[in-house]
Amino acid sequence: MDDWDAAVDWDDADLGESAAVLYSGGCDSTLAACRMAERFSTVHLVTFTRFGFLETDNPSLHIERMRQRYPDTTFHFHKIPYGRFYEAVEGHQKLRNLWRFGSMTSVPCGSCKVAMHWRAVVFCLENDVKVVADGAIKGNDHFAEQNPRILMPELQK
């Protein structure tokens, strides 16, 4: 068993036939999508958009190649706005905090990732998808949302 799927019981028959991937179109999320295509007949490639995001059409570049590589898997590309989720996480006082605390204000990247994962959970609930993956790599475990020592104990309560 690889490290990437150590937390998943792949023998559990209740995983369903589909998986979702938070998909940017980069090499890490494309690899995650390919790994999901090896196990599921349907893979939902979910790209989130909000004000300030550029080049959100880039993910479509690799989809046709994945369809050719995994002809038995159906890939669905979803481009989903998630701005209100980001605003809820980032908070309504971000400009005030920037003025008050300057560079000590929290970096929005963490809030953005949390909002994407939150919106991904909603997507999965709406579409009866029980498995979701992203292209997070171990080198980013300095972010709380990508560090199992921080996140997993809270989820396992």
Please state what every model-predicted region is.
Residues 44-46, 78, 133:
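Hydrophobic/aromatic beta-strand patches that form the interior of the parallel beta-sheet core
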Residues 39-42, 67-76, 155-157:
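Structural alpha-beta junctions
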Residues 7-66:
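ATP-dependent adenylation/pyrophosphate-handling site
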